[in-house]
Amino acid sequence: LNAGIEANVEKIILTSSIVAMFKKPNRTNPYTFGESDWTDTDWSGSNDYTTSKTKAEQAAWELMESKGLKDKLTVINPGGVFGDALDKKTNTSTSYVELFLKGKYPMAPNFGILISDVKDVARAHVLSIKNPKVNGRRLIIGSEVKKMLEVSKIMAEAFPKYAKKLPKKEMPNFMVKLISYLDSSVKIMLPDLGILMQTDTSYSEDLLGMKFKPAK
């Protein structure tokens, strides 16, 4: 950021995440989050990943505001990013797809995820560069929130040969908690179990002049 400021660049686009927005205690259910919301990094339910994303974005806004350059910054906040991959490596989002297809989850954990198409995310970055409407804004990128069981059903339709391996029922929350004692990677799910996340991304579509691809 400092290098960009020193070079007097016209616009800075920062990639963040919705995890910088919705992690906080005492959430209602369903819980609606938006552009003005921030994750509480002091909350025990905020893990290293969500804390790092939140603090990095907050530091960016603080720096730009201190320089009087807030309007030169636009932040892109996608959800779970799915779609065409550049290589065979899986990221946090696509790892769920891989584990489902391999039959690692007999049942789907009870939580939802905002589905973001990777091409929509890329396009949002490009469109933001020359668009003054998004100056100083946080743009939530994604079409709709889907529960993991719904994701499994979509995958079964798209990949019939894997249908038998995919979860067909929702895993009780207590079972997920028990598994978390054996598998530390499951612990990050616990704070969001049973909470239906909701958000309205139409403002991002309007500002960018684009329509996000549906989850399916």
List where the protein language model places each region.
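Active-site Tyr-X1-5-Lys
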Residues: D42-T74
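Mid/C-terminal beta-alpha module of Rossmann-like enzyme folds, strongest
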Residues: A124-I188
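Conserved Rossmann-fold NAD(P)-dependent oxidoreductase catalytic core, especially the SDR/UDP-sugar
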Residues: L1-D48
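Glycine-rich Rossmann NAD(P)(H)-binding loop
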Residues: G83, A108-F111, L139-K146, A156, ...
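Glycine/proline-rich active-site loop of Rossmann-fold NAD(P)-dependent oxidoreductases
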Residues: K67-K70, G83-Y96, S128-L139
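A conserved pocket-lining segment of Rossmann-fold NAD(P)-dependent short-chain dehydrogenase/reductase
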Residues: D40-G45, K88, T94-D120
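Conserved C-terminal active-site "lid" loop/helix of NAD(P)H-dependent oxidoreductases
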Residues: L178-K211
